Amino acid sequence: MVFFTCNACGESVKKIQVEKHVSVCRNCECLSCIDCGKDFWGDDYKNHVKCISEDQKYGGKGYEGKTHKGDIKQQAWIQKISELIKRPNVSPKVRELLEQISAFDNVPRKKAKFQNWMKNSLKVHNESILDQVWNIFSEASNSEPVNKEQDQRPLHPVANPHAEISTKVPASKVKDAVEQQGEVKKNKRERKEERQKKRKREKKELKLENHQENSRNQKPKKRKKGQEADLEAGGEEVPEANGSAGKRSKKKKQRKDSASEEEARVGAGKRKRRHSEVETDSKKKKMKLPEHPEGGEPEDDEAPAKGKFNWKGTIKAILKQAPDNEITIKKLRKKVLAQYYTVTDEHHRSEEELLVIFNKKISKNPTFKLLKDKVKLVK
């Protein structure tokens, strides 16, 4: 976008706003460009479409600015607009619009963007006029490439000396040349894709080769193992060629046998320890059994027979030993069950069944009295 300064009032104005500023500032006769400093009298500012950049301004004498592709296309587009204004078959409304468009340096080159730009910048909302303007542009753009092709064609057909030489060249060389030309024409992306595909193919081929080699190496090993197994089953000795493999298999078997023997020994030791621990526990429990009162004869209830358990007698004996013939249910239960396990050889009943029997014996027997969490012996 080009900016000007008014020489009369000194205000900076955009190129689009110059006409509005002239109607306000009556003494405005000359405008000077802010970037390049040139003076423009009257309507000469309309031809000043583009100015130098800051790099060109402050770059020095030897500076050469880079030409951008977009700028070249934009300049060609604006030139096309100025050529369309000179056409005789253009309506006056469209011509006025084209003159306004030529003052801008950022005219879009696609239909949708061009029409939106016309609506926003030039305030033209009539779609028929917009379509007319765009049709003129499209006709001009389509006619240009045809003219260029006609100019590029030679007037007289010139004999091609390479054609005669190519007929003598063999077909293989011609194919190579065509392939080389095709490779040159390809983009960087296509080349990259081809390289990646080649790498993938090479990797797949290497994997297949490695897999085949591994399978070949594994097959003879399996056969050797099968032969050894057959020979061992038949009672024959393994040949000297396969002696190392046979020794390994024998060593493995010996190790397995020794490991199984050790496990058996360890298991037997553990069982012995458990049995000894059980015996010591039973002895301790027998020591804790209630003793007979001094000078008195033992009661029939307190001497249970081996194998059967006397619930009533054991409970009575434990309560007699307790102070005031009274003990908590928890302690009583613990002592009674301990006595039960020592007396009975085989534990056929579960702990839940034993607890049910214990509760029945306490609650239903009149000699025992329950006081909250305690049991008392009634004399």
Curated annotation (Swiss-Prot):
Interacts with PRMT5; this interaction is direct. Interacts with GNL2 and RPL23A. Interacts with nucleolin/NCL; this interaction is direct. Interacts with phosphorylated IRF3; this interaction impairs IRF3 DNA-binding activity. Residues 175-219 form a coiled coil. Residues 161-307 are annotated as: Disordered. Zn(2+) 2 binds at residues 33, 36, 48, 51. Induction: Induced by MYCN. Induced by interferon-beta. Predominantly expressed in testis. A zinc finger (C2HC LYAR-type) spans 1-26, 28-52. The keyword Transmembrane helix does not apply. It is found in: Nucleus; Nucleus, Nucleolus; Cytoplasm; Cell projection, Cilium, Photoreceptor outer segment. One of its GO terms (cellular component) is photoreceptor outer segment. It holds the Pfam family zf-LYAR. One of its GO terms (molecular function) is transcription regulator inhibitor activity. This is Cell growth-regulating nucleolar protein. Residues 173-196, 203-216, 256-265, 276-295 have a biased composition (Basic and acidic residues). GO terms for biological process: erythrocyte development; innate immune response; negative regulation of innate immune response; negative regulation of transcription by RNA polymerase II; positive regulation of phagocytosis; positive regulation of transcription by RNA polymerase I; rRNA processing.
